[in-house]
């Protein structure tokens, strides 16, 4: 057993995984239990009181985290005319129409977000089999189908997180990195949870946010005591 495995085993022996942890304790334990050399992401899983089998209770939205998520985001923009210069000035890595579509078909996906102006969607929809499974298809709700290209690129670059529930009614997202200051993680978490609350379907009854778990890429997952959050 190597040193990292021994350290992780020792840490796990002192963690009560059945306990609801204060948010400060949760972050401290996640930082303490990080044993890998790379900067792990801090991920959140939220169990919601929704019926995912009913389309009117499924959630799909986005929010911009105040402290970003700790990594650079590559943006592809489908647009034309004057918007090409605007997209370039805003920092988009890939810009085009049919030419960009052909590039993606031949070379695959090497970007994190796709943004499109409405007039470009006829081309983008033809990439459905490529973009759809990767959850990259532009969407009006997410602000990725827009006439305001500059704002959409800025949001994507500065910490916009897109989310949707899975078939079990759970939302998964990244809200930061292990090297973030505790307050930065808490600020991101509060903004994310506020967005989740606003996205609550009117048809959802009973307890809406049932469980919150924070974890790291290669580390442990801890349940958070919601009474210690700014909900």
From Swiss-Prot:
Pfam families: Ribosomal_L1. One of its GO terms (biological process) is regulation of translation. SUPFAM superfamilies: Ribosomal protein L1 (SSF56808). It comes from the Bacteria. PROSITE patterns: RIBOSOMAL_L1. One of its GO terms (cellular component) is cytosolic large ribosomal subunit. GO terms for molecular function: rRNA binding; structural constituent of ribosome; tRNA binding. Keywords: Repressor, Ribonucleoprotein, Ribosomal protein, RNA-binding, rRNA-binding, Translation regulation, tRNA-binding. Belongs to the universal ribosomal protein uL1 family. NCBIfam families: rplA_bact. Binds directly to 23S rRNA. The L1 stalk is quite mobile in the ribosome, and is involved in E site tRNA release. Protein L1 is also a translational repressor protein, it controls the translation of the L11 operon by binding to its mRNA. Part of the 50S ribosomal subunit. This is Large ribosomal subunit protein uL1.
């Amino acid at each position: 057993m190597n040193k990292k495995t021994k350290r992780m085993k020792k840490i796990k022996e002192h963690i009560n995984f059945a306990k609801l942890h204060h948010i400060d304790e949760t972050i401290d334990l996640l930082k303490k239990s990080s044993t890998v050399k790379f900067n792990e992401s801090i991920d959140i899983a939220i169990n919601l009181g929704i019926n995912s089998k009913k389309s009117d209770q499924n959630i799909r939205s986005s929010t911009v985290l105040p402290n970003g998520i700790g990594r650079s985001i590559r943006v592809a923009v489908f647009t034309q005319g004057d918007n090409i210069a605007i997209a370039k000035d805003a920092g988009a890595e890939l810009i085009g129409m049919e030419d960009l579509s052909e590039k993606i078909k031949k070379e695959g996906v090497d970007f994190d977000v796709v943004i499109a102006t409405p007039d470009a969607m006829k081309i983008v929809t033809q990439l459905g089999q490529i973009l759809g499974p990767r959850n990259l298809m532009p969407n009006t709700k997410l602000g990725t189908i827009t006439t305001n290209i500059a704002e959409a690129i800025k949001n994507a670059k500065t910490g916009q997180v897109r989310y949707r529930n899975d078939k079990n009614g759970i939302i998964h997202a990244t809200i930061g990195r292990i090297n973030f200051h505790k307050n930065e993680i808490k600020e991101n978490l509060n903004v994310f949870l506020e967005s989740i609350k606003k996205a609550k379907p009117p048809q959802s009854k009973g307890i809406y946010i049932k469980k919150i778990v924070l974890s790291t890429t290669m580390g442990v997952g801890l349940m958070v005591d919601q009474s210690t959050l700014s909900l």
